[in-house]
Structure formats: structure tokens, C-alpha cells
């Protein structure tokens, strides 16, 4: 298959993906990114940190999807609150998304000091861009190519979250406003060119199997308007909060293997690999996804 045709194929997938399907930046290390999926989780773990991550999918394809993120999470204990922030850039073929996400959570403690409830709000900004120079000149009559090269959209979300140190669970909705997002120069275009609401439901539970080892079964469900729902389940093993490994499965999409370690109680490193069950698997090599995350703790986390 010629490279220009492959590039156009990737463009069609990515434009359709962002205009009608899942439009939020993605990580398979979601246990490391609670506030990314739910603003109410911001600061609730009381682990002040900053981090970076890089995700590389389907490397055998030209213009394969890549995601870069920098993020932070901080508890505001005097205010019974927490804040979280994400800056990210997605690149897929000739398309790219650059975005920012700010989250604020108010924390409510019950009489049992281990029980915490979070009520959160988030603000998102997304710039979707198209590099027309990367597309074949023969596609010049396409209405998408006749439109603007970039589009900025602002949206918001909200969530609730609960944790008691063992059980954590939450529900959130992103892109409540459903701002318009289309590059096509087509009169009376359908409403599909917009940000769709994403509903996220998550739960995990720590099971102590010894003095030093925890099993953590976890689940994440995404309900996306105008797109199939996604169900992700996993099991992690954590040893002394210093070494962890796990297995995950997103139904009908991919399996995930991941492992990580903490260095000097101030730095943690996590690597994961996705093996896709989709038709991409027919291509030899490069049809999976690699993700690497690095966190820097601003204070020594409580053990």
C-alpha cells in the first residue's frame, strides 16, 4: 500500500474519530490519572506531583497516533480542596489536537476520617488542527480541505468521587456544553461536528493479601454519545507501593500489560504495552501501543 494512500486512510480514521467518536485524550494507565477522567478526584489522594507521559500507537503506519502529556495534581488542605491540570498534544497523520484541562475539587470528610467525597468541576480548551500540506493534492476538492486549518473549542465538565483508602469510585461527565468542532466548509453541516459528552464511571478496590502486597481490581466504563460504549477491566499487584504490575482488557479492543516502580520515594516510572484485537493486528509488527509515564512527587508520599 502506497504511503499517500495510507496517510489519507489515517486521516479519515482520525477525523472521524475526533468528530464523532472518543474525542478526549487517552491513556491506558488510568489508575495513575484519576483527575484526567474525573475532576472530583483532583488532589484527593494528597500526593502532590507533576508528571509527563508519551504514548505511541501503531508505529508501523505512517502518521501513527502519538500523545504527549504534562500534568500536575495538588491538594489544598487548608481549603479542603484540590486542583489538577493537564496539557496535551495528540498527533495523527495530518491532524493534531492541542488541549488544556483544569480541574477543581472540593473535598468533604465524614466522621470517619478515611472517608472523602469530592465534588469537581473542569474547564477544557481544545484546538483541532489540520496540516493540509501532508495530504495528497488530488484531494483538494474535499470540503474538509476547503475549510479552516484549525478550530478552537471551549467546554466544561463535572464529577463526583469517593474514596476511603481501600474503595475508590466516581462518576463524571466531560464536554457538557458540546461545543461545535468541524473543519468542513459545508453549508448546513450536520450537528455531528461537535464535542460529544463523555460519561466516565470508575471503581477500584485494594485487597491486602499480606503486609506488603495489595491486589487492586479496577474498572473503567466510558459512555460516549453517538459512539459505542467502552468497558475496561484490570487487575494490578502493588508491592510496598514501590513496585507494581498488572493486566488490563478493554472489551473487543486490546489487552494491556504494565509495570512500574518508585525510585527514592520521589520518582515513579510506569511502562505499558497494548496488544490490539482489531484488524490492525493483521499487520506484522508495530500494531500495538507503547506508553511511558514519569512522575515527580513534590513531597514524600505517606506510606
PLM-predicted stretches and their roles:
Residues 20-303:
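Subset of outer-membrane beta-barrel
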Residues 3-5, 22-23:
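Short, basic/polar N-terminal leader/transit segment immediately after the initiator methionine
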Residues 4-15:
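Sec-dependent N-terminal signal peptides
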Residues 1-4, 110-112:
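Positively charged n-region of N-terminal signal peptides that target proteins for export
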Amino acid at each position: 500500500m502506497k504511503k499517500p494512500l495510507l496517510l489519507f486512510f489515517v486521516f479519515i480514521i482520525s477525523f472521524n474519530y475526533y468528530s464523532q467518536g472518543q474525542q478526549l485524550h487517552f491513556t491506558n494507565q488510568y489508575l495513575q490519572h484519576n483527575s484526567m477522567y474525573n475532576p472530583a478526584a483532583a488532589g484527593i489522594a494528597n500526593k502532590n506531583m507533576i508528571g509527563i507521559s508519551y504514548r505511541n500507537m501503531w508505529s508501523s503506519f505512517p502518521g501513527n497516533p502519538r500523545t504527549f502529556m504534562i500534568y500536575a495534581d495538588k491538594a489544598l488542605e487548608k481549603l479542603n480542596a484540590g486542583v489538577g491540570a493537564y496539557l496535551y498534544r495528540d498527533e495523527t497523520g495530518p491532524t493534531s489536537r492541542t488541549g488544556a484541562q483544569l480541574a477543581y475539587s472540593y473535598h468533604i470528610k465524614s466522621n470517619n476520617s478515611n472517608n472523602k467525597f469530592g465534588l469537581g468541576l473542569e474547564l477544557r480548551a481544545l484546538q483541532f488542527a489540520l496540516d493540509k500540506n501532508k495530504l495528497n493534492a488530488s484531494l483538494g476538492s474535499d470540503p474538509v480541505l476547503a475549510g479552516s486549518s484549525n478550530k478552537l473549542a471551549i467546554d466544561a465538565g463535572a464529577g463526583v468521587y469517593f474514596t476511603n483508602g481501600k474503595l475508590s469510585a466516581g462518576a463524571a461527565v466531560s464536554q457538557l456544553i458540546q461545543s461545535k468542532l468541524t473543519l468542513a466548509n459545508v453549508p448546513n453541516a450536520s450537528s455531528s461536528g461537535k464535542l460529544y459528552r463523555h460519561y466516565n464511571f470508575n471503581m477500584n478496590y485494594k485487597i491486602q493479601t499480606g503486609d506488603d502486597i495489595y491486589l487492586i481490581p479496577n474498572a473503567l466504563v466510558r459512555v460516549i454519545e453517538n459512539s459505542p460504549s467502552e468497558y475496561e477491566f484490570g487487575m494490578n499487584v502493588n508491592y510496598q507501593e514501590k513496585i507494581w504490575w498488572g493486566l488490563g482488557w478493554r472489551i473487543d479492543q486490546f489487552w494491556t500489560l504494565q509495570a512500574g516502580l518508585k525510585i527514592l520515594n520521589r520518582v515513579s516510572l510506569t511502562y505499558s504495552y497494548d496488544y490490539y484485537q482489531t484488524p490492525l493486528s493483521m499487520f506484522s509488527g508495530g500494531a500495538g501501543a507503547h506508553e511511558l509515564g514519569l512522575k515527580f512527587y513534590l513531597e514524600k508520599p505517606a506510606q
